Design a protein with these regions (language model features):
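Class I SAM-dependent methyltransferase SAM/SAH-binding core
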Residues: 1-33, 53-58
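A short His-aromatic
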Residues: 47-48
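Short glycine-dipeptide loop
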Residues: 63-69
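C-terminal helical/coil "lid" or tail adjacent to the Rossmann-like core of SAM-dependent
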Residues: 119, 123-182
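Conserved catalytic/acceptor-binding region of the Class I
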Residues: 70-137
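Short hydrophobic/aromatic beta-strand or adjacent loop that forms the aromatic wall/cage
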Residues: 185-191
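A conserved beta-strand element that flanks and buttresses the S-adenosyl-L-methionine
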Residues: 41
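Local beta-strand N-terminus motif with an aromatic residue
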Residues: 37-38
């Protein structure tokens, strides 16, 4: 997350009158702050990590007594569209492969509950949602994710720049078609109180 997004979050919190919220940019690979927070929230991070258990343990350690750890992570195998679309299929294959080559697990969401248990985090609660769109900003999520990861797809030699460009065009035409449907990934939320 960059400083621009953090400034937007700070502004939104100030507009809402929230004075007890802090937004900071930290490297999760070496972040350690035991018993420092009433709530620790982590969204869409663990599937990028080769050692998600390490961060889960450190996040749990950062929660004060009476506080909560809330983690959301996707299971990208759950994405779908209708009717079938080559650009969408390219996005799923390419994005998943980049995550894998960089040491992550694009389906970590379904493993999150087991991760809590293995990390010794007691009594986790589990919820899952899967957004679906026929129009609007949410429907552009697959396209915008493919666009944002285009350089990584080429750098990892998953596909050529020309293949990415062609798939972006195919996926965009599909996205703006009001007769089509695109889902997001299944999103697993697991939480526990200390």
């Amino acid at each position: 997350m960059d400083e621009v997004k953090l400034d937007l979050a700070r502004h939104a919190a100030a507009q809402a009158g929230l004075a007890n919220v802090e937004f900071r940019q930290l490297d999760v690979r070496d972040w350690v702050e035991p018993a420092s927070y009433d709530a620790v929230f982590c969204r869409f991070v663990l599937h990028h990590l080769s050692e998600p258990m390490d961060l889960l343990r450190r996040m749990w350690a950062a929660v004060r007594p009476g506080g909560a750890l809330i983690v959301e992570d996707p299971d990208f195998d759950g994405w779908c569209c209708h009717p079938p679309n080559e650009g969408f299929d390219f996005f799923l294959r390419s994005y998943g492969e980049v995550i894998k080559r960089r040491g992550g697990d694009h389906a970590y969401g379904r493993k999150l509950y087991a991760g809590f248990l293995a990390a010794g985090i007691p009594a986790p609660e589990v919820h899952a949602v899967q957004p679906v769109w026929t129009a609007g900003e949410g429907k552009t999520l697959a396209w915008s994710t493919l666009e944002a990861t285009a350089d990584a797809i080429v750098a990892e030699r998953v596909a050529t720049a020309q293949e990415v460009t062609a798939s972006l065009e195919t996926l965009w035409q599909f996205t703006v078609d009001t007769q089509t449907l695109i889902s997001g990934p299944r999103i697993f939320q697991v939480s526990s109180r200390r």
